[in-house]
Regions:
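Glycine-rich beta-strand-turn "strand-cap" elements at beta-sheet edges
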Residues: 1-13, 44-76, 101-133
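Surface-exposed interaction/gating patches
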Residues: 7-35, 39-42, 46
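Generic intrinsically disordered, low-complexity segments enriched for polar/acidic and small residues
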Residues: 17-19, 36, 84, 120, ...
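Short, well-ordered beta-strand segments in beta-rich or mixed alpha/beta enzyme
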Residues: 17-24, 63-101
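Residue-level signal for secondary-structure boundary sites
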Residues: 28, 91-93, 133
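Short amphipathic alpha-helices in soluble, non-transmembrane regions
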Residues: 33-39, 96-104
Length: 133
């Protein structure tokens, strides 16, 4: 991958990212897809990049590596999901946070999300800043 392509990708995703890892019962897959679509449409209107992933397998590829499904105690009846929200910079992240808190649609979406994740669990969240390496 050339430097110009890498730079273009990096500029497109910004320098700040929030990640959310959570377990969803397989029976809630379609409802969670719909919820992520609704949330994504709203949050993209705030100018962020929102990506959603589902874990493909639960096998560790080699000794010394633990699959995330094991780390968060996912069962065979559950899927492991990952959501990433990219912001241009910390100021943009703060601005989006204010918009989310003031958006009346967010409360019901949050409530629905808590009903869809595995009972007794929630979201594992991390806020990251990109390192320039």
């Amino acid at each position: 991958m050339g430097k110009s392509i890498t730079t273009e990708i990096e500029q497109g995703i910004g320098s700040e990212v929030d990640h959310f890892v959570y377990r969803v019962p397989k029976k809630n897959h379609d409802l969670t897809m719909q919820l992520c679509k609704e949330f994504g449409e709203i949050i993209r209107s705030y100018g962020v990049v929102h990506l959603v992933f589902r874990l493909n397998n639960t096998e560790a590829p080699m000794e010394g590596i633990t699959n995330i499904a094991k780390t968060i105690s996912a069962t065979q009846d559950e899927e492991v999901w990952l959501e990433l929200i990219f912001y241009r910079d910390h100021k943009h992240k703060d601005e989006v946070g204010v918009k989310m808190r003031n958006d009346e649609r967010m409360g019901p979406l949050w409530q629905r999300s808590m009903e869809l994740v595995t009972q007794g669990t929630g979201f594992i969240m991390g806020e990251f800043s990109r390192l320039k390496v």
